[in-house]
Amino acid sequence: MDSSEDNPTWTLESLKTSIDDASQAMQVATQLSEMLATNLSNLTLNPSIKLPYLPEYPSQLTGQLPSEKTPHRRRGVRTVLSERRYRMQKLIESLRLRYAKGIPRSDSQRQLQQQEDTEIRSRVRRFQCTCSYCQFKRNPSDDNYENYYNTTYSNYAMESNES
């Protein structure tokens, strides 16, 4: 399959001319870079130095689509501000779901909330010893944390207040 069949505007002559134009532009660019390198020691602006300008060529090659020459726009880049905004939205959403008692929820949301509540209760539940003495002979009121704190640390608190 011939390349001229793909795009009839491209011919052998147009390819040769575009290659010649590119080589001329490359020669001018190398001359410009050499001149800049030699004038690098003189860092002051000198209006007498005349730099050759690059010739203007059409930026769009024949057969190139206009959408191909435009740079892609960057999307989805995470910055500190966007990450903070995202976390704040998630926090607000979670607070709204947790404390919005008056708003009727769907069954799935209710079940999810009940599961979260039971998980929280299971984490908060106090330690219970599984030995036979604690299971059968201890008073259940002794398991109360406030009573334990008051009986264990009350003398220590009184001693620290006296000194």
From Swiss-Prot:
Key word Nucleus present: yes
Sorted UniProt keywords: Chromatin regulator, Cytoplasm, Developmental protein, Nucleus
Regions that span the bilayer: none
Pfam families to which the protein is assigned, alphabetical: PGC7_Stella
Subcellular location, record wording: Nucleus; Cytoplasm
GO biological process: epigenetic programing of female pronucleus
MF GO annotations: methylated histone binding
Tissue spec. comment: Preferentially expressed in oocyte.
Any one GO cellular component localisation term in the record: nucleus
InterPro entries according to UniProt: Dppa3
Origin: domain of life: Eukaryota
Function, as annotated: Primordial germ cell (PGCs)-specific protein involved in epigenetic chromatin reprogramming in the zygote following fertilization. In zygotes, DNA demethylation occurs selectively in the paternal pronucleus before the first cell division, while the adjacent maternal pronucleus and certain paternally-imprinted loci are protected from this process.
UniProt remark on domains: Mediates binding to H3K9me2 via N-terminal region, while ability to exclude TET3 from the maternal pronucleus requires the C-terminal part.
Record protein name field: Developmental pluripotency-associated protein 3
Organism from which the protein derives: Bos taurus (Bovine)
